[in-house]
Amino acid sequence: MMYGLLKGKKGIIFGALNEQSIAWKVAERCHEEGAEFILSNAPIAMRMGEINALAEKTGSEVIAADATSMEDLGKLFDAAIAKFGKIDFILHSIGMSVNVRKGKHYTDINYDWLEKGWDVSAVSFHKVMKTAWEKDCMNEWGSILALTYIAAQRTFPDYNDMADNKSYLESIARSFGYYWGEKKVRVNTISQSPTVTTAGSGVKGFGGFMRFAEDMSPLGNATALDCANYCVAMFSDLTRKVTMQNLFNDGGFSNTGVSQKVVDKYNGE
């Protein structure tokens, strides 16, 4: 169902790789709700993915940018300003861990890889906002979002150093969000259920954990489409006074100590 919630709004969406990507679903829903946007991802990710198909579907321009590069980000935002003038929303859906990819245990992580993942997954969010801030390119009541996961606050062993990255990401949203208030721009993170994406599927034991989260969540896991709908709401004018928050979109998992389904399994029922 479409409501025209984003009619006339312009933005930048980072991180769409393929149809499994949450950012891909967000782009589709933003388009359906009337928004125009630029799609961006790192050059290597664009070669691996299918972003051009999404661009064609949504009538969007694709601009390659390494979100860890201030030079690339500067060029991207200059292009957005030339195309749209000031913009209304930004989605940061970027994350990676070389330690996870290489199967390094948390007690034996490679610190060079740690730094790389930290830069890509968290510091890039600060760099994106710093670039937008310096170019003064956000309209009043604009909205900036990043996607995160509850492992930022609770221990999930196989999530490895991505948990640390997400924790820092959430802190950046609060810290920079305070200053963005001066410009009447809101900054939030959405803590999503475990979701089948290219990045998420690389975590050891991911399938089992998804089933566990489903059993633990009163409403079940939130899908990528559910997350996209939440992003649309957060980009819309209906949420103007929501800022500096970590918003759980997880079917109630974050506030459930134990569910009856899980208890029954341990009781053999």
What is each of the regions a protein language model found here?
Residues 57, 63-74, 78-83, 89-117, ...:
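Conserved mid-core segment of classical short-chain dehydrogenase/reductases
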Residues 123, 189, 207-242, 247-251:
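C-terminal helical subdomain
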Residues 13, 91, 145, 187-190, ...:
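Hydrophobic structural elements of the Rossmann-like NAD(P)H-binding subdomain
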Residues 30, 180, 234:
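Aromatic pocket-lining residues of Rossmann-like dinucleotide-binding sites
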Residues 3-39:
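Canonical Rossmann dinucleotide-binding motif of NAD(H)/NADP(H)-dependent dehydrogenases/reductases
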Residues 15-25, 95-182, 191-196, 220, ...:
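Catalytic loop of short-chain dehydrogenase/reductase
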Residues 243-269:
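Short C-terminal tail/terminal secondary-structure segment
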Residues 33-51:
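Conserved glycine-rich Rossmann-like NAD(P)H-binding loop of the short-chain dehydrogenase/reductase
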